[in-house]
Curated annotation (Swiss-Prot):
This is 6,7-dimethyl-8-ribityllumazine synthase. The lineage of its organism: Bacteria, Pseudomonadati, Pseudomonadota, Gammaproteobacteria, Candidatus Pseudothioglobaceae. (2S)-2-hydroxy-3-oxobutyl phosphate binds at residues 94-95, 136. Catalyzes the formation of 6,7-dimethyl-8-ribityllumazine by condensation of 5-amino-6-(D-ribitylamino)uracil with 3,4-dihydroxy-2-butanone 4-phosphate. This is the penultimate step in the biosynthesis of riboflavin. HAMAP family: Lumazine_synth. It comes from Vesicomyosocius okutanii subsp. Calyptogena okutanii (strain HA).
Amino acid sequence: MEFKFNKDGSRDFLSKKKIAIIVGYFYQDICDNLLLASQETLTKYGIKANNINVFYAPGAFEIPLLAKKLASQQINGKNLYNGIVALGAVINGETPHFKFICNECARGVSNVSYQYEIPTTFGVITTNNMEQTIARAGGYKGNKGEEATMAMIIMLYLMQQADTQFF
């Protein structure tokens, strides 16, 4: 996914943004691939490495609470983080546990975005097996870490546009 905008102008806009990446670290190898793609995407678009903070949650279920905590942090009345990217993997097993975890994680992440009006994107892979997971963590289906990060970057632009539009 390539967002069409002036990359030179975008570097100025993004260079001062502070981003939190939350990694539900249950599947370490998979999550490492998601995290690396996310970090590379952020730096490619001008976000400085020292403005990217990575937080590790034990699993996907814990991501929304950590996202809410990070979204609520402020300095001098302004949000500490301009955007949050949630990454992880949940693989279907033999019980309904998969549905509960996936639904609550997705709902919780979206609620953070709505409540705090901070772009908070969902890069948690939810698949039926490890083969599908690998395919979406840098394999032939792309990398959900990169995709979620691009969605967050695009939302940063759109939120700024929405704030500055005059009708």
